Amino acid sequence: MRKKWFEEQIVEFKTRSDNEVLEYLSSYWNITPDAKGVLTMVGTYKKADHKDKKGNDFAYFEDIRNTEGDILYYPFGFGKVKLWTTCNDKLEKQDIWRINVKLSPKKFRDKNPFIISLADTNFGLPSTNLKDKLSRESQIRKIFKDTGFTERDAKNTVNALHNIMDDLYSNADDRFVYELLQNADDQPEEGQLVSVILQLLKEHLLFMHNGRVFDTDDVDSICSIGDSTKRKDKEKIGYKGIGFKSVFTGSDTVIINSGNYSFAFDKYSPVYGDADMNNIPWQLKPIWQERYRYPKEVKENETFWEERVGISLEVEEDNLNDYRMSIARIFTHPIFLLFLKNVTNLEFDEGELRTKISKSHDGDILRIEKDGIVDSSWVVKDYPIIIPQEIRDALQDDHNVPEKLKKATMTQISFAAKVEDGKIVKLDNSVLYAYLPTSVNDFGFNFIVNADFLLAANREQLHVKKIWNQFLFSEIGKLLIDWVASLSTVIPSYLEILPNSLLNEEETGILSLSTFFNKAFTEALESESFIRVSDEEAVKQEEIVIDKTGLSEIIGSELFLNILGSDKHLPFDSIDKSVFNNKIFEKVEKVTSDTVIPKMIGNARFVEWFKSTDDENRNNFYNWLISKDCDRRRANIMSLVDNLPIYKFGDVFFSKGETISDLNK
């Protein structure tokens, strides 16, 4: 079918004028002719190793390219462009020359209506940028050749690749978006933040960003398994070297355009011929891709060429809606932006519908916006952590630990709590973050914690028995109290962030990490001053007392504590005292009516308060006392009342007992 169509096109082009043929060629090759119809190209000069039919030496230009460096093929299957020329010793000084060509006279275009020939003998030097591009192309071709060089190596690589991808991404329809986001976040242009655009076309999904263009190390990394350049770079959040492979779970043709790189991973490329693709690691074999031969809707997409990095995933029509739903699902809850270091703006373009999300700081608050409207607000704090020498020593022999962690002396743990109208919004079983969300929500945190966790290859689960993760959980338990204390002056409900009780523990499985959290958390809970008692002061939990009676709200904190004979403090008025019912505060002293009423009897300062306060407060006290009446307290209440100066004669107060005594005199 394709061959027949080619033949029909060739016949049709033979009837066209030279100008029409030239116009088609210039558009096809992405070359603009001058006023005389001359096209500028570059080619490699070669002297033939044999003579022509007349016994003369001759030469030719091969590897003909446009000035952008794309190899030129004639349309409709006529093969690569090649140009004949006379021998020229001066051209042997270097391989590549800039040349001028024109459409050959019609008598030479009987079989191929597009044949071109040299327009003149004015040869020039190619640009430095072109030389760089040719170097990049050479790298791509070498990787393609070397990867799976023997049949045995190819089969082993395929098996390893399939095992990894089956384990990682069999149940992760949208994981590839996170992996591409991570790559973009790890690739900022120096001094700039990163903006990402996802665009869904009729047959392709485009992922584009304005970060740093690919270099040789980046290319080597994505063309290998587990050989990530990020393993040694402490500024980058990834390190596995296999995240990019997630794009192949839904696409068999992936094109990358970045800087002077243009290549594809293509399961159906003609370069494989009739080979059994089950035995070829095509996901690791890059194929150089001339830009003028990109799929039409990608080639015509202006944004794809404007951004520094463009990735195109070919999507089957039946899967388009799945991609649309996966991305929409991610955009519905854009809190994944919280801990990304460099990505601050993200756009999803579906054609008629566009969704934009971004993050920005407003003082202590980090806001995430969706289409210009605040979607959520967060208080976030980062803690730089010194890594103890014993932890560093323990990491050295673990092959699962990236080199950047083995050499690191510092790491970072971050906390985030959602806030609305100045109050904490508790989250339900939030997942742990390793800059992007994992699937671990077993700990029931109502806040978000982010750290350099050692993750399984799919970036969704934690390595449970790794000493590094155990160390991080200890630090999280300790720092949680400090973070909460730092919020006490700005968020009155700050104590609600804390877990109600210690985390559930188990000997094996993910909750075995709870042991390390609980130990450090308990120690910090008892040793840190984090309960605010005034605008200026916070104290330890052993230094507070909780008024379960409500009396302090009537008579004031100072008098209440005097009645108790206590040098402790009552929590600040803005704190919701119900939080102290949680199990983590079970050691905090709680004062009940059974305790305080007997201590009020005969207390001189309380009597003075009673005399000097106003009628409203006295009435509030009476109502309070009535509300506490019950059989077990009645005797103490009666005794308290008998000793209260409830009778006033002139400016003098008398208790019931004093009044009766005076009357009997």
Outline where the language-model segments fall.
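OB-fold/S1-family single-stranded nucleic acid-binding modules
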Residues: 104-126
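GHKL/Bergerat-fold ATPase module
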Residues: 1, 77-80, 124-139, 145-149, ...
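Short, acidic/hydrophobic/Gly-rich beta-strand patch recurrent on exposed beta strands
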Residues: 59-65
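Conserved short strand/loop->alpha-helix "switch" segment adjacent to the catalytic nucleotide/phosphoryl-transfer site
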Residues: 149-179
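Structural detector for short beta-strands of small beta-barrel domains
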Residues: 8-11, 15, 23-56
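Beta-strand/loop nucleic-acid-binding surfaces
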Residues: 68-91
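Conserved ATP-binding N-box helix of the HATPase_c
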Residues: 168-196, 243-250
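Flexible ATP-lid and adjacent glycine-rich G1/G2 motifs of the Bergerat
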Residues: 207-267, 271-273
